[in-house]
Structures are given as structure tokens and as C-alpha cells.
Amino acid sequence: MRKITTSAYMPTEIEVKSVSENVANITAYPFEAGYAVTLAHPLRRLLYTSTVGFAPIGVKIKGVSHEFDSMRGMLEDVAFFIINLKKIRFKLKSGSEREVIEYSFKGPKEITGADLNNDLVEIVNPDAYLATINEDAELNFSVIIQKGIGYVPSEEIREEIEDEYIALDAFFTPVKKAVYEIQNVLVEDDPDYEKIVFTITTDGQVGPVEAFKNCLEAMYQQMSVFKGILDIDVSAPVASSSASGEFSKLLSSVEDLNLSARSFNCLDKAEIRFIGELALMDENELKELKNLGKKSLEEIKAVMEEIGYPVGVDVLKDSKEQLRKKITELKSQMSAKE
């Protein structure tokens, strides 16, 4: 049953799973009902619009005057050459924001992204097809590679490059796909809390986790404008006054520790139900538990250290009384149901 509170539940868990080099799942929970989508939707939009990438913004081809021209000895006309060029994903090695890269090829040759790698740029999709030229043809062209965010149409790029270059629509974002799913998650017998599961796919210019970090940074920077009227730091998480939010892991059942049957049965007989109860005990208190042997003691100590609450170390400090009170409340509720 949902209780009356004075602040929203503070999410405490974040999980990052690498599916492949360019795909990752990022999960955060638990959120109050409605909060998950409120956060997930703008983050998804920012992933597309704020992630920095590289794109060709202009091309100059020897013997070609405009994008609807054709070139003798090349299978594709210039329009299709440009379409293929925009599909190739460049990454500048120098750290600069703009470079002009020159290329020269003699036929017969099928040109792919791998042929465009050099000391200035890395092609992250080397198998991408560009053009085919016959044995009598020679293809000489230069490309302007620019660093940027989002999408910029060729009409606006026209003003930033020299007249002899054909302006290109620039798709800077390295994020190919960003989707999220809102799932329900159980918190203290309440199934109405929520979990955000992001699936992020990039083209290889940046990794999906790096793209997500950049997205969060962009959101914090945009929110910083409110510092002028609010006496809070919006660039950092605001601490929750909710004990359940702070002690999410500690209020989980000792069953979640996956202890051996001997160790679990000993805790069960001692009516130790929550991980937080172990976190509040020192080694001597554990030794006093009936039938708790040396092996079980060492197992519990190892597991508690693994989850960040080593036995005998005062990690909780000023939060101990608050945790004791919460555990007492939960145990009372459990007894009332029995």
C-alpha cells in the first residue's frame, strides 16, 4: 500500500550492459509512477540532438560543376556519389573541428570507406560503398569534414564553405537509434514503481555509453539557467529525505544475498530478514548467532563486503537509527500480515 510521503522516491540503481561494441542497454530504477517517462523522453531527444559527431559538409570533384552533373568513367552519377558519400562515417584523428581531405583514385576500382582511411581521418564503417570507376577513369575529389551536433541542411552550410564546393546536408549525430522502455518494478510489495531501460545504438564515432554521458551533461548544462532564480544546484542530484530511497538495497531480503542453505537457515532462525540488519551488526554480534559456524561467518562477511557494507565498518554512520526504525516498521507490518 502506498504511503503518504513528502518527497518522491529517489532512484538508486543503475545498470549498464554492453550488448556489442556499438550497442548498450542502460537501466535506471526505481522511479515513482510517471517519473520514468518524464525523464526518459527528453533524454532520448537529447541523445539525437546533443551528441557530437563528424560529417562531410562539402565536396569538390575535379571536372564536375554541380550535383546533377555526371562524370565520365564513373558508374554512378554525381547525385548518387553524394548520397553514398553522406553514408560514410568519418572521424577526425587530429582533434580539430574541420579538415579538408583530398583523394585521388585510378581505375579500374571499386571504392569503399576503407579506401578513405588516412592519417587525418578514420572511417568507422569501412565496408560502406562509395563508387566504381572503370580502367580509363581517374577520380579526384576533396571533402570538408566538420565536427558538429544534430542536423544542418545544405542551404545553411552553403554560407560556410567556398563556392567551388557542393554543399551537403550534414547528419552529425552518431546515434543511429535510441529507444526506451518503461517497465514496472516491485518496491516493498508495491508493483507501481517504474524502471527505464534505454537501448542505444551508435555508428562507431562514439560508444553508446559515452553518448549517454554526453546527453546527461547537456541536460545539466541546459538546466543550469535556473540557478539564477533557485537556491539549489540543479547540476547535481538532490538528496532524498525518503529512507526507503536511501536504503533500497539494505531493505532487500537476505534471500537476495544467495547465501548457502546453512548460512541462510541460521539467519532465518535468528529472525534476520533484511540485509540492513546484517549491515548494522559487528563481527562479535554475528558470532553470537546460534549455530553460525566459522564458514558461514566468513561467507556472510565476504558477501557484505562485496555489496559495499563490510562487517565491522561503520559505513552507515548517522543513518543507522533511521535504518533501524525502518526495519522495525517493516517487520511489524510483516508480523501483522501473518
From Swiss-Prot:
Molecular functions per Gene Ontology: DNA binding; DNA-directed RNA polymerase activity; protein dimerization activity
Cellular-component GO terms for this entry: cytoplasm; DNA-directed RNA polymerase complex
CDD domains assigned: RNAP_alpha_NTD (cd06928)
Chain intervals for the UniProt region annotation (Alpha C-terminal domain (alpha-CTD)): 247-338
Source organism, top-level taxon: Bacteria
Free-text function comment from the UniProt entry: DNA-dependent RNA polymerase catalyzes the transcription of DNA into RNA using the four ribonucleoside triphosphates as substrates.
Catalyses which reaction(s): RNA(n) + a ribonucleoside 5'-triphosphate = RNA(n+1) + diphosphate
Family under the similarity heading: Belongs to the RNA polymerase alpha chain family.
Keyword Transcription: yes
Enzyme Commission no: 2.7.7.6
Coiled-coil residues: none
Gene name of the encoded protein: rpoA
Name the UniProt record assigns to this protein: DNA-directed RNA polymerase subunit alpha
Keywords, alphabetical: DNA-directed RNA polymerase, Nucleotidyltransferase, Transcription, Transferase
Alphabetical list of InterPro entries matching this protein: DNA-dir_RNA_pol_insert, DNA-dir_RNA_pol_RpoA/D/Rpb3, DNA-dir_RpoA, RBP11-like, RNAP_asu_C, RNApol_insert_sf
Domains (record comment): The N-terminal domain is essential for RNAP assembly and basal transcription, whereas the C-terminal domain is involved in interaction with transcriptional regulators and with upstream promoter elements.
GO biological process: DNA-templated transcription
